[in-house]
């Protein structure tokens, strides 16, 4: 953290001290290895002398028994709480009155006034007054802590000075998201895959990773819970962990209205570092690209997974009107060239007029003539008003034995 000073006068009666408050760390321990079965006992004797000098009773552990204060200004990461102690010291031989301290934090986009209780106080000679201030860091990039001091001497002269402390803020984690839509799922479910990477230089433990959905969706977390679920939440530097969420429409009776929705929700993450310092981040609103279904959408509602050869079976289908106008639809069936599955239902059947955001159900009778995995194709839908044709192939696969 670099420091700059701006004074209204070169002779100041007060001095300003700013110290960042951070948690200590365990002192590293230089272990001494010796052979426990050494017949001479020299190694054990030497290890005992080392323990006596270092005041450490255990040399078989990677960390010591003592804590050490931070030796330098360490990195500050987005989502953490920046805590510092600001102290105004009267270094003169006379008292000063009406001492007021103002602390501001300036970023590239805003200037935040931090709460400070040092206002209109009197500081006697060689005395001081200060306060601990905390602020949650919500932006990355260069930050400037501005501390301004106003006071008055006993002779009535108004004095003023301020100090600037610059420090950078980095990203502790990197979040990448991917959206998946099940094309054959009429419920308009959306799957979100979130990849979280530890971009800091220290270990972190993910306490919570949740998806706060928008008002149109409800969310279900899909995670694999093993015998030790906490182990997978520990992220070392550059480690990546994946999370999967399923978002389902709240209004199950109008799933077609969800096809144009792009706002999904926000990811909310919280973690702790190796010494228990807490961090929290929330992403901006996640946006997905709405899938394009065209004017009509065909889905298979019910079909057997396995059938016997030369035994007919039925496939239940549902046709949605995804357009903004009514459609007059007709069903035509084309037999595939390989004829491994023969559709026995009549062709040219009228499905009637279908209003917007509505659906119509129909069934297909299929006769399998060859074994293996066979695909159902040849479904043709015609809008008799506009003469537009919609082709649907490979709508389902059946195993014929």
UniProtKB/Swiss-Prot annotation:
It holds the Pfam family TRAPPC13_C. GO terms for cellular component: TRAPPIII protein complex. InterPro entries: TRAPPC13, TRAPPC13_C, TRAPPC13_M, TRAPPC13_N. Belongs to the TRAPPC13 family. This is Probable trafficking protein particle complex subunit 13 homolog. It comes from Caenorhabditis briggsae. The lineage of its organism: Eukaryota, Metazoa, Ecdysozoa, Nematoda, Chromadorea.
């Amino acid at each position: 953290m670099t420091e700059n000073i701006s004074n209204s006068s070169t002779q100041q009666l007060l001095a300003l001290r700013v110290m960042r408050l951070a948690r200590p760390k365990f002192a590293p321990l230089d272990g001494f290895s010796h052979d426990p079965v050494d017949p001479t006992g020299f190694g054990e004797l030497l290890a005992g002398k080392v323990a006596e000098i270092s005041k450490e009773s255990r040399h078989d552990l990677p960390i010591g028994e003592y804590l050490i204060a931070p030796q330098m200004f360490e990195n500050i990461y987005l989502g953490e709480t920046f805590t510092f102690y600001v102290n105004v010291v009267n270094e003169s031989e006379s008292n000063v009155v009406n001492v007021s301290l103002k602390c501001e934090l300036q970023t590239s986009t805003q200037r935040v006034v931090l709460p400070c209780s040092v206002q209109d106080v009197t500081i006697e000679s060689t005395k001081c007054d200060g306060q601990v201030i905390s602020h949650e860091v919500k932006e990355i990039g260069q930050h400037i802590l501005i501390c301004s001091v106003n006071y008055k001497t006993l002779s009535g002269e108004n004095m003023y000075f301020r100090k600037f402390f610059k420090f950078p803020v980095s990203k502790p984690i990197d979040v990448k998201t991917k959206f998946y839509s099940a094309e054959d799922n009429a419920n308009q479910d959306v799957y979100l895959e979130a990849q979280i990477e530890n971009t800091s230089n220290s270990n972190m433990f993910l306490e919570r990773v949740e998806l706060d959905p928008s008002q149109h969706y409800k969310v279900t977390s899909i995670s694999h819970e093993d015998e030790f679920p906490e182990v997978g939440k520990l992220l070392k530097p550059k480690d990546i962990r994946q999370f999967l969420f399923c978002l389902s429409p709240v209004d199950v009776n109008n799933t077609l209205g969800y096809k144009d929705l792009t706002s999904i929700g926000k990811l909310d993450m919280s973690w702790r570092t190796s010494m228990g310092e807490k961090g929290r981040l929330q992403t901006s609103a996640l946006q997905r690209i709405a899938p394009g279904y065209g004017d009509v959408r065909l889905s298979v509602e019910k079909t057997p997974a396995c059938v016997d050869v030369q035994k007919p079976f039925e496939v239940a289908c549902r046709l949605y009107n995804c357009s903004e106008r009514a459609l007059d639809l007709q069903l035509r069936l084309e037999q595939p060239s390989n004829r491994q599955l023969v559709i026995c239902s009549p062709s040219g059947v009228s499905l009637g007029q279908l209003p917007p955001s509505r659906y119509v159900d129909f069934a297909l009778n299929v006769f399998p003539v060859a074994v293996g995995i066979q695909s159902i194709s040849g479904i043709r839908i015609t809008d008799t008003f506009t003469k537009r044709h919609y082709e649907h192939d490979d709508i389902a696969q059946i195993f014929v034995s």
